[in-house]
Swiss-Prot record:
Disulphide-bridged cysteine pairs: none
UniProt xrefs under Pfam families: NAD_kinase, NAD_kinase_C
InterPro entries according to UniProt: ATP-NAD_kinase_N, ATP-NAD_kinase_PpnK-typ_C, NAD/diacylglycerol_kinase_sf, NADK
Active site per the UniProt annotation: D71
GO BP annotations listed: NAD metabolic process; NADP biosynthetic process
Stated name of the protein: NAD kinase
Chain's gene name: nadK
Needed cofactors: a divalent metal cation
Family that this chain belongs to: Belongs to the NAD kinase family.
Superkingdom assignment: Bacteria
The protein's Enzyme Commission number: 2.7.1.23
Role, per record: Involved in the regulation of the intracellular balance of NAD and NADP, and is a key enzyme in the biosynthesis of NADP. Catalyzes specifically the phosphorylation on 2'-hydroxyl of the adenosine moiety of NAD to yield NADP.
Binding-site positions, NAD(+): D71, G72, N144, D145, D174, T185, A186, Y187, N188, L189, S190, Q242
Length: 284
């Protein structure tokens, strides 16, 4: 997007949040003051009583997307826009997020800098999970994480894991989190996994409540592929905490970093470690 003139942006609002109407009106006014047209996605528009455009239309016509809400809204926006390779700006609706790190009060200054080509774009890794069902290949993409877990809360699960087609480990516990660097501060962190720098070319494999103190998180190079399967019962594959798929006995899921990436827009002075310190309250 170097030296590209920004003419049009698409906006997605946090679902079930009609109180964001006034914030959206302020946002639209700011962009319009710099001669930038704003399109709002259909569902968001309906929520606040405005007219909108289809998600496909705004992805095809706009220079970037604006996710207005929180990290969950941004993740949903990322997942819907995977195939369009369009940058996304996250604006939080009150609380600083790991991903939605710009406030509405900062938007005017940010848009002015956009017109001067003064902003930053990070490229973030995405996980690709593949399952073969009825001789059909099903691909799923995760921005944060892929979780393999049990179908019943009262049971533990055995997960056989291979790395680059070689036997690696068998996890016995509540499941396994496979996390991107971006997702390392989400479920992965809660499960005791490491914080990964978001632009690094690696991913993490973290057991959830393992029934052994020797089962520890592992960080793997981005070019590696892991395969996971269960030998005793069905399992659930959960993508970014939003989509759930069943893994039947005899089936396996292959997970690796995808060739596609996600582009996130930030302020010129954005520093990931400043956000990390504030969110995790380090140094307090």
């Amino acid at each position: 997007m170097d030296n590209k003139i920004i003419k049009k942006v698409g906006v997605i609002l946090r679902p079930s949040s009609p109180q964001l109407k006034s914030g959206y009106e302020k946002l639209e006014k700011i962009f319009s003051s710099y001669s930038i047209e704003v399109l709002i996605e259909d569902k968001s528009a309906k929520m606040i009583g405005a007219s909108g455009a289809s998600f496909k239309k705004i992805c095809n016509e706009c220079d970037f997307l604006v996710s207005f809400g929180g990290d969950g809204t941004l993740i949903s926006t990322v997942r819907k826009s995977f195939d369009y390779d369009i940058p996304i700006l996250g604006i939080h609706a009150g609380n600083l997020g790991f991903l939605a790190d710009l406030s509405l009060d900062e938007l005017d200054s940010f848009v002015e800098k956009i017109t001067q080509n003064r902003y930053k774009i990070d490229e973030r890794a995405v996980l690709e999970a593949t399952v073969i069902k009825n001789e059909k290949e099903i691909k799923m993409y995760a921005f944060n994480d892929v979780v393999l877990t049990r179908t019943r809360v009262s049971n533990m699960i055995h997960i056989e894991t291979l790395v680059n087609s070689r036997s690696f480990n068998t996890y016995y516990g509540d499941g396994v989190v496979v996390s991107t660097p971006t997702g390392s501060t989400a479920y992965n962190l809660s499960a005791g996994g490491p914080v990964l720098f978001p632009m690094s070319n690696v991913f993490a494999l973290t057991p959830i409540c393992p029934h052994s103190l020797t089962q520890r998180p592992v960080v793997l190079p981005g070019k590696f592929t892991i395969e996971m399967k269960t030998s005793e019962e069905r399992a659930l594959i959960i993508i970014d905490g939003q989509d759930v798929h069943e893994l039947e006995l005899g089936e396996s899921v292959h997970i690796k970093l995808a060739t596609k990436t996600v582009k996130l827009m930030h302020k010129e002075e954005y520093n990931y470690f400043d956000v990390l310190k504030e969110k995790l309250r380090w140094g307090e």
